[in-house]
């Protein structure tokens, strides 16, 4: 607490308990009559005429605590105003970034959807036309090659099943090992509609195209088996794209496929693969729930299924 002194002068007489100019004691009684004594006559007048200027001292107390509190409140108000302004600017910039991200994701999904639909329609059309013309060409002799047709479709079904086991082995032994530098892009946030991991789809398409081409241009049981194998690889690739890329990673909408219960379990199992909870298991796709059952973690699978269902309902 600080003290300030204010001093002012006045011409008024001040009364103190003790007169600074006391009168002689003999004034208390009647003064003696002295002739020709001017001091006796004029002493009272002199005392009455003398005036002492009053000195007033005013002490002004300054409360440092109160001053500090008021200054603190003012600074707090200014700080709160600055914080509100900063938060408002941050919210605006965040909203702009979210809008840009949403627009970019929407564009990426549309781009991949167009590519997926065009490739699927093209491959499906080519497969159907190839099957039709191959068997119609072989029937020109008048005999229906039932045995060859049966072997072709049987191997097509077997090739589709076998591709699941091939994908499981390749995923574990190659993609998460020597080819991790390519597959790693699939385990990171994607930037753009495509990723380096998509090259594996092209690599798997090469033998399918070769087998289909050889089986289409040649007659006989062996060419028929090759044609069936290429057809099975093609069907598996299309199913893998819609379930893995569309349903699991939501690179494009898949429609009613998302409501199929078994496909929901497949998607949840593959999501557990990306969580690395069980050393990467499952490495397969369509038989992923079976792999989790083998390691005894079906409870975690059910939790993930329920989580995905709740998340889809919120959307």
UniProtKB/Swiss-Prot annotation:
Outline where the chain's transit peptide begins and ends.
1-58
Note the effect listed for residue 186 to A.
Loss of activity
Please report, in chain numbering, the residue ranges of the motif Histidine box-1. Answer: 171-176
Q: Which UniProt keywords apply?
A: Carotenoid biosynthesis, Chloroplast, Hydrolase, Iron, Membrane, Metal-binding, NAD, Oxidoreductase, Plastid, Transit peptide, Transmembrane, Transmembrane helix
Which residues are listed as membrane-spanning? 112-132, 146-166, 196-216, 222-242
* CC per GO annotation: chloroplast membrane
Q: Where is this motif: Histidine box-3?
A: 244-249
Top EC group: oxidoreductase
Sequence motif Histidine box-2, residues: 183-187
Outcome, altering residue 171 to A = Loss of activity
Q: Which GO terms fall under molecular function for this chain's record?
A: beta-carotene 3-hydroxylase activity; hydrolase activity; iron ion binding
Q: How does it sit in the membrane?
A: Multi-pass membrane protein
Q: Where is this motif: Histidine box-4?
A: 270-274
Q: Name one Pfam family in it.
A: FA_hydroxylase
Q: Give the Enzyme Commission number.
A: 1.14.15.24
Q: Which reaction does it catalyse?
A: all-trans-beta-carotene + 4 reduced [2Fe-2S]-[ferredoxin] + 2 O2 + 4 H(+) = all-trans-zeaxanthin + 4 oxidized [2Fe-2S]-[ferredoxin] + 2 H2O; all-trans-beta-carotene + 2 reduced [2Fe-2S]-[ferredoxin] + O2 + 2 H(+) = beta-cryptoxanthin + 2 oxidized [2Fe-2S]-[ferredoxin] + H2O; beta-cryptoxanthin + 2 reduced [2Fe-2S]-[ferredoxin] + O2 + 2 H(+) = all-trans-zeaxanthin + 2 oxidized [2Fe-2S]-[ferredoxin] + H2O
Activity regulation: the record says:
Inhibited by o-phenanthroline and 8-hydroxyquinoline.
What effect on the protein does mutating residue 244 to A have, as reported in its record?
Answer: Loss of activity
Give the principal location in a single coarse category: plastid
Intracellular or extracellular location(s): Plastid, Chloroplast membrane
Q: Which family does it belong to?
A: Belongs to the sterol desaturase family.
Question: What is the annotated role of this protein in its UniProt record?
Answer: Nonheme diiron monooxygenase involved in the biosynthesis of xanthophylls. Specific for beta-ring hydroxylations of beta-carotene. Produces beta-cryptoxanthin and zeaxanthin. Uses ferredoxin as an electron donor.
UniProt note: domains: The histidine box domains may contain the active site and/or be involved in iron binding.
In Swiss-Prot or TrEMBL terms, this protein is called Beta-carotene hydroxylase 1, chloroplastic
